[in-house]
């Protein structure tokens, strides 16, 4: 996250860290939505992944930190009008909720335009050069209406959200992918894509719109993985 500050240790209990299981490289963020399921971005996928829950500083382990790996992964492939950007990961075994681990509930309503939203992650804090922090950074950004989004990115599909600061300087960045966009306390977006370098004026970040995928997410969790 560019232009943010170290997150409060208690504000990101649902934020998970995805690591490449072979190289041990930090890849992406993700969001815990219940004891067995994590949502992230599809391009974060690797054949082997470790998922760390309850982490703050990458180099200092909490007593209640837990590690899981994907038991099964599901990608959205149901409707050509939707972006194929998100990934549901079923964990190999349920997570124990604790002081530093609790889920973020799915949204009950779509986000209202002009919401102030919170983003967070262990992604780049400078762009360029690439500086990765040991602790997650958090920032507040604004949700933009779809016209602003299309103005910045004319070929943008519809099932997305754009958020940022029009004058630039605050934005999600590389390796924040997969983490949450939280608007008015609700989990509304998944970090997907943005300009390179990050945090440019008039170039908001792009997020998968969680509300538009609720039926699919809930059916996958319920065990129905076919498209209705």
Curated annotation (Swiss-Prot):
Alphabetized CDD domains for the sequence: Tryp_SPc
Gene3D superfamilies on file: Trypsin-like serine proteases (2.40.10.10)
GO CC annotation, single: extracellular region
EC number: 3.4.21.74
Pfam families reported in the protein's UniProt record: Trypsin
GO molecular function, one term: toxin activity
Tissue: Expressed by the venom gland.
Glycosylated residue positions: 45, 81, 145, 224
Biological process per Gene Ontology, one example term: proteolysis
Major localization listed first in the record, in broad terms: secreted
Subcellular location: Secreted
Catalytic activity: Selective cleavage of Arg-|-Xaa bond in fibrinogen, to form fibrin, and release fibrinopeptide A. The specificity of further degradation of fibrinogen varies with species origin of the enzyme
Principal EC category: hydrolase
Coiled-coil segments on the chain, per record: none
Activity regulation text: Inhibited competitively by amidines and guanidines, and irreversibly inhibited by diisopropylfluorophosphate.
Keyword presence, Hydrolase: yes
Function: Thrombin-like snake venom serine protease, that cleaves alpha-chain of fibrinogen (FGA) releases only fibrinopeptide A. Shows coagulant, esterase and amidase activities. Induces the barrel rotation syndrome in mice, which is manifested by gyroxin-like, rapid rolling motions. May also reversibly increase the permeability of the blood brain barrier (BBB) in mice.
Assembly, per entry: Monomer.
Family: Belongs to the peptidase S1 family. Snake venom subfamily.
Protein name per its UniProtKB record: Thrombin-like enzyme gyroxin analog
Lineage, highest ranks first: Eukaryota, Metazoa, Chordata, Craniata, Vertebrata
